[in-house]
Amino acid sequence: MSKQSVLFLGSKPIGYHCLNYLIQHQDAFNIEIIGLLSNDNTTFDSTLSLKKLAKEHNIILIDALNEMPESDFIISVQYHEILKKQDIEKAKILAINLHMAPLPEYRGCNQFSFAILDGKKEFGTTIHKMDARIDHGDIIAEKRFPIPTNCWVNELYDLTYSASLSLFQENIANILSNQFTLQTQKDFENERGTSIHFRNEIHDIKRIDLSWDKEKIERHIRATYMPGFEPPYAMIGNEKIYFSTTWNEKK
């Protein structure tokens, strides 16, 4: 039986480990990974390069979406570009995305921050079928977990990363063998709610107004203080005054 072809689109540690899992199980899953698209974002871990991993296993590097060949499957994990209808249709069987947030509650970007700002008690991660709208396609599999009290954004990221890798490893074999059911997100919108956020919104929620009450200030700091990124700040005159974790420890 001929192997099914897979195009992998991804970045960040979760993308690296999902790609590596597929590489290690190519024979068991009866697949061939025929190409990788990645911006090789190593912000979270400089040792995890998807492009280097692909080269080590003779996987072709593809520079742009319009250069993708047809494949049986497209698997997207934290890919940095939005796929258009014509891109998704390059998958003859199925195009899927691993979205590190619960759906339909949090589509788009900065989902960890907004969940903390919204005071959510539960978070999650989702594998869904891709369509032309952002994080909108039918749900294939999901995993949910409680958000700890006074959770910081990096803690929620770590919890979601672990849940996402487990979700992928537990479900990808069935997905590749067409053993799954689809659930439309619309069926959950009344119960769960829905929102979409964009990458540039993080700049607005990092700006702290010192006239806010203490709880709101603390919540914004917990939601936006991520090691390796610009910290939350307040403007005093024309100067940015940055907050740090020591503020939380001394309060």
Please give the residue ranges for each predicted region.
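One-carbon transfer enzymes
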Residues: 1-251
